[in-house]
Amino acid sequence: MAAVLTREEIEPVLTGTKFHQFLGIRLEEVNEQSVTIRLPYNELFYTSADGYIHGGILATVIDIAGYFAVFSQLNQPVPTVDLKIDYLRPGRAGDLLFTASVVKLGRSVSIADIVAADTSGKAVAIGRGLFSSKQE
């Protein structure tokens, strides 16, 4: 297996997408086991009625984190095939950290597990993504 991509190799890909720029996500950490992405607090992402982050935002960044965990290992586009999210508790105002770990690197499909947590480490959602890792 090739070496894991470095922060310097991943960051331009992550931040070069206009949608990612809108979200404000930042690469927090990259290592051989995982990728961590920070979603800074943005009041636009929270419901006005109860002050919790919208589940669609959580799902979106879970997907992005899983993608980059697999991408960091394969250095090729890995489109999402399937995504499962379990919402554990309401995400209150504040930054969130999304840590994705590769469970399996396959010839056709790879799997990543993702934890979305507040800055105290309390998980607000977990996800599992399946990503197409087929070589073209």
What do these predicted ranges mean?
Residues 1-136:
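Terminal targeting signals and extreme-terminal segments of soluble enzymes
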